[in-house]
Amino acid sequence: MRKKLLVVVCLLILILMLPGCGKTAGPLDDYQGIDVVSPDWVGKLDAAGDAKQMLIVAAFSADATDAWISLHEKQSDGSWHMVMTSPGFIGKNGLGKTREGDAKTPVGIFHFNRAFGIADDPGCAIPYVKVDQDTYWSGDPRDGYRYNELVNLKDLPGLDLESGDSEHIIDYPYHYQYCLNISYNEEGTPGLGSAIFLHCLAPAKPFTGGCVSIPEDHMRFVMQKVDGSTAVVIDTYEALSGGTDWPDSTWPQER
């Protein structure tokens, strides 16, 4: 079953990488989600005890760049249901982020603390910032320059733009239509790493610089569903599931 899952994911990812598949040219179709019982291991995760909602990023191995991303919600009876599932990408060098520029996705339990994007607010529970020409994500390690935060150049006119460490959000029209910041290095320790987002899939690259990417229609759905209390759980599929297979009953079924 795991081999079958990997083959299907690889095929879906190849399709999504085709020009025009990551972002639609016309009006974006609404992804309506799914509603199926989550695999048993989801409810056994450490984050499941306190969380009412979990976004799970399950990489196929520690050095893989592809992953299966799913959103789960706790029901009134304590059971978990999966409401979104999608193939996606993680860092070019897999999992295990420890420093700026290592092109790895962090492992652990996080939350979303910022919502922003080039597009209009899709209806976020987290306060949303529509970016403009002056919006950057700061990678400037100097004191007072708000490393690992969304900033406006009008407020920080001295931000270092020459090094390329700070991301100019509108320069990434595919990736950053919609973005949620994952709370890695929330304290903003310079050099530990910055700009770890859940964002839209872009064509051509089967990896990210450390972020997590999913198709734009799925991303918009996620932004409409999650809030600041949503647990973001990232690890290998084997570590998360204990090596169990992903049941056939949880394959995507459109509502």
Question: Regions from the language model: what does each represent?
Answer:
Residues 211:
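Short cysteine clusters
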